[in-house]
Amino acid sequence: MDWNWRILFLVVATTGAHSQVQLVQSWAEVRKSGASVKVSCSFSGFTITSYGIHWVQQSPGQGLEWMGWINPGNGSPSYAKKFQGRFTMTRDMSTTTAYTDLSSLTSEDMAVYYYAR
């Protein structure tokens, strides 16, 4: 029997306590093993050139694992070794949105993905 893994991506936005900051994440995503997924987080109330944009993964029953961040000054991403090669972070200054693309999905990618500043 051929099993197709379906991978759930749920992006949750987190930030420090600040009443003016708003974050809107993309909906949960379901993808087959081997596919790719792009998730997003739109934000307002702060400038993306003043704060780093971090992505964090939490697999079922596991702790938080830092995936990488986008440098606020030059927009360059930096990745944790585990995620290098399959994971791409970008930001769109015009829409104040951060994106992450994850390719060649496996069952190990089933997790909740957090955005943090």
UniProtKB/Swiss-Prot annotation:
Coiled coil: none
Sequence segments annotated as region (Framework-2): 53-69
Top-rank taxon, per record: Eukaryota
Keyword RNA-binding: no
SUPFAM superfamilies to which the protein is assigned, alphabetical: Immunoglobulin
Record key words, sorted: Adaptive immunity, Cell membrane, Disulfide bond, Glycoprotein, Immunity, Immunoglobulin, Immunoglobulin domain, Membrane, Secreted, Signal
Sugar-bearing residue positions: N74
Region annotated Complementarity-determining-2, chain positions: 70-77
Subcellular location per the Swiss-Prot or TrEMBL entry: Secreted; Cell membrane
Region feature (Framework-1): 20-44
Region (Complementarity-determining-3): 116-117
MF-aspect GO terms: antigen binding
Chain positions covered by the region annotation Complementarity-determining-1: 45-52
Location of the Ig-like domain: 20-117
First and last residue of the signal peptide: 1-19
Function: Probable non-functional open reading frame (ORF) of V region of the variable domain of immunoglobulin heavy chains. Non-functional ORF generally cannot participate in the synthesis of a productive immunoglobulin chain due to altered V-(D)-J or switch recombination and/or splicing site (at mRNA level) and/or conserved amino acid change (protein level). Immunoglobulins, also known as antibodies, are membrane-bound or secreted glycoproteins produced by B lymphocytes.
Protein name: Probable non-functional immunoglobulin heavy variable 1-38-4
